[in-house]
């Protein structure tokens, strides 16, 4: 199956294989975990299927959902949508203010989700979140490898600049064009 192929390609690398929405397939494929949305199984139910050693991530859109994910045993949360997304349609956006507040409220790793691309990733990082989930930023790009590496390098330089108080403006102006 495609899930098993994904898991095999990530084995032995510094990469996790996370299956979307389906904890049963995560178990059968040997994946590292599952990511569930608000319309899927709860983190608690996913945990019962996965057991204690696999990761459970949950997409959240507000504080109530975040708190439920934490209580249900999620290992990480996605917060969003931060910006308008080409992948999924939402009637409202939590935006950067929700992202910043949530990131400061929980000890769980927080991933920003929704409409994130090379043009706005700096705004996400500036509110203190250095983990992102992207889809259309990569799949809609003319050069998939180039944009993927650009996003990774951008995250790396932002992290270094944050830790070392380094000015990355020249780097940003090169990669954001």
List where the protein language model places each region:
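Alpha-helix-loop-beta-strand connector modules within alpha/beta enzyme cores
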Residues: 2-16, 46-58, 92-112, 151
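Hydrophobic faces of well-ordered beta-strands that scaffold small-molecule active sites
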Residues: 17-19, 34-36, 56-58, 77-79, ...
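Catalytic cores of alpha/beta
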Residues: 22-31, 62-72, 116-132
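Alpha-helical scaffolding segments of alpha/beta enzyme cores, especially the outer helices
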Residues: 1-8, 24, 28, 41, ...
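Glycine-rich phosphate-binding active-site loops on the catalytic face of alpha/beta enzymes
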Residues: 38-45, 78-89, 125-147
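Hydrophobic alpha-helical signal peptides and transmembrane signal-/tail-anchor segments
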Residues: 152-176
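Glycine/Thr-rich beta-alpha phosphate-binding loop at enzyme active sites
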Residues: 29-31, 36, 55-100, 104
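Active-site beta-loop-alpha junctions enriched in small/polar residues
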Residues: 22, 39, 61-63, 82, ...
């Amino acid at each position: 199956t495609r899930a098993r192929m994904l898991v095999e390609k990530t084995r032995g690398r510094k990469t996790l294989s996370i299956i979307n929405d389906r904890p049963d397939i995560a178990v059968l494929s040997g994946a590292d975990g599952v990511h569930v949305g608000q319309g899927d199984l709860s983190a608690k139910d996913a945990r019962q299927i996965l057991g204690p050693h696999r990761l459970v991530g949950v997409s959240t859109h507000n504080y109530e959902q975040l708190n439920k994910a934490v209580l249900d045993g999620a290992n990480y949360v996605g917060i969003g949508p931060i910006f308008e997304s080409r992948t999924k349609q939402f009637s409202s956006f939590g935006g950067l203010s929700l992202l910043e507040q949530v990131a400061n409220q929980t000890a769980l790793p927080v991933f920003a989700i929704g409409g994130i691309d090379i043009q706005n990733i700096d705004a996400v990082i500036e509110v203190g979140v250095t983990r992102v989930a992207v889809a259309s930023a990569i799949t809609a790009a003319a050069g998939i490898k180039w944009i993927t590496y650009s996003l990774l390098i951008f995250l790396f330089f932002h992290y270094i600049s944050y830790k070392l108080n380094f000015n990355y403006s020249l780097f940003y102006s090169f990669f954001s064009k």
